[in-house]
Curated annotation (Swiss-Prot):
Keyword field contains Amino-acid biosynthesis: no
Keyword Metal-binding: no
Entry protein name: Transcription elongation factor GreA
Entry superkingdom: Bacteria
Alphabetical list of InterPro entries matching this protein: GreA/GreB_C_sf (IPR036953), TF_GreA/GreB_CS (IPR018151), Tscrpt_elong_fac_GreA (IPR006359), Tscrpt_elong_fac_GreA/B (IPR028624), Tscrpt_elong_fac_GreA/B_C (IPR001437), Tscrpt_elong_fac_GreA/B_fam (IPR023459), Tscrpt_elong_fac_GreA/B_N (IPR022691), Tscrpt_elong_fac_GreA/B_N_sf (IPR036805)
Protein species of origin: Hyphomonas neptunium (strain ATCC 15444)
One family name in Pfam for this protein: GreA_GreB_N
Length: 157
């Protein structure tokens, strides 16, 4: 069973989503199915079929979340440190050509959100940065060609 690395924040978010699905969404869809059933003939009951489809989606997501939480390897980023880039690090990098700076936090796959500056540990940028230190350069393969980045700052918070 492969472990899934995630921050405490990411773990809490998955638990919160699971709680909502089990305590709010599941009972709501069961009530909707019951209501649709009361309308008679199920073979031509679009409301019933839509509710059953939604139930299938919700049950699938619950199963997926249960599995991810069971395999979670929760990493407390506040207890990490050092100068090397690892999971949980907040890294400031600069494009070697343009000198544009960007800051990313390296997180688990389910937590990744580029708009919030969070990238997956399995992303090309994160894979290129892992193990680097401040001042090191990392080359990232991109669709438009390879880009070189310099590690400016590594922080664990």
């Amino acid at each position: 069973m492969e472990r899934i690395p995630m921050t405490a924040e990411g773990h809490a978010a998955l638990q919160a989503e699971l709680k909502v699905l089990k305590s709010v969404e599941r009972p709501s869809i069961i009530a909707a199915i019951s209501e649709a059933r009361s309308h008679g003939d199920l073979s031509e009951n679009a409301e019933y079929h839509a509710a059953k489809e939604k139930q299938s989606f919700i049950e699938g997501r619950i199963s997926e979340l249960d599995d991810k939480l069971a395999r979670a390897d929760v990493i407390d980023v506040s207890k990490l440190g050092g100068s090397k880039v690892r999971f949980g690090a907040t890294v400031t990098i600069a494009d070697v050509d343009t000198e544009d700076e960007q800051t990313y936090k390296i997180v688990g796959e389910d937590e990744a959100d580029v708009k919030q500056g969070k990238i997956s540990v399995t992303s090309p940028i994160a894979r290129a940065l892992i193990g680097k230190e401040e001042g090191d350069e990392a080359e990232v393969a991109a669709p438009a060609g390879a880009r070189a980045y310099e590690v400016i700052k590594v922080v664990y918070k």
